[in-house]
Design a protein with these regions (language model features):
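Switch I (effector-binding) loop of TRAFAC-class P-loop GTPase G-domains
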Residues: 2-7, 108-111, 134-160
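N-terminal accessory targeting/assembly segments
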Residues: 1-43
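Conserved catalytic network of the ASCE P-loop NTPase/AAA+ motor domain
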Residues: 11-15, 39-42, 81, 148, ...
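Conserved, well-folded catalytic cores of nucleic-acid-processing
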Residues: 13, 17, 40, 71, ...
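Conserved beta-strand/loop subsegment of P-loop NTPase cores
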Residues: 18-24, 42-54, 72-77
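Canonical P-loop GTPase G-domain recognition
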Residues: 53-120, 138
Length: 168
């Protein structure tokens, strides 16, 4: 069915990225997570982006940040709509992938941009975040046949490329 297809697509995308950005709603971090994410992402480094921080309780949020740190993730609280704290996303991605890039460097591989993808349930602000990180509007071209195959890498900052994953 639909879920199995989504799962397959995510697994395919995962092969191409170094880090996963899991986007959740800062007001309801746990219930705004996709339950199959953990199973699919498995061992990939993960940055948990708590969006809509402007609308959430700061005390609660620091508890949630600690919860995600304890799980081995790199949490960042942002307000995508107003473009707040977005610089921290790139910094967290650099931290989350440092080990992998050290290994690549040791093997003599050339330095390259970190490749990331965003996962999250609908209405957590994925499009807003992508557009703000990219500092431009990424066309919503979901209904034309064949677009899903044409994934594009969106440059973010100096060290990051974001895989535009329609509908994940």
């Amino acid at each position: 069915g639909h879920m199995a297809k989504a799962k397959r697509e995510v697994s395919e995308q995962l092969k191409k990225v170094d880090v996963v950005f899991e986007l959740v709603d800062a007001r309801i971090p746990y219930s705004s997570r996709n339950p199959m994410i953990d199973e699919v992402i498995n061992q990939k480094p993960r940055v948990v982006i708590l969006n809509k921080k402007d609308m959430s309780n700061l005390n609660e949020m620091s508890k949630w940040e600690q919860f995600f740190i304890d799980k081995g993730y790199y949490p960042v609280s942002v307000d995508a709509k107003h473009g707040k704290n977005l610089k921290k996303v790139e910094a967290a991605a650099i931290k989350a992938t440092a080990e992998k890039f050290e290994r690549e460097k040791a093997k003599g591989l050339k330095p390259r941009a970190i490749r990331a993808m965003i996962v999250g349930i609908p209405n957590v602000g994925k499009s807003t975040l992508i557009n703000k990180l990219a500092k431009r509007s990424i066309a919503q071209t979901g209904n034309k046949p064949g677009v899903t195959k044409q994934q594009q890498w969106i440059p973010v900052g100096n060290a990051l490329q974001l895989l535009d994953t329609p509908g994940i």
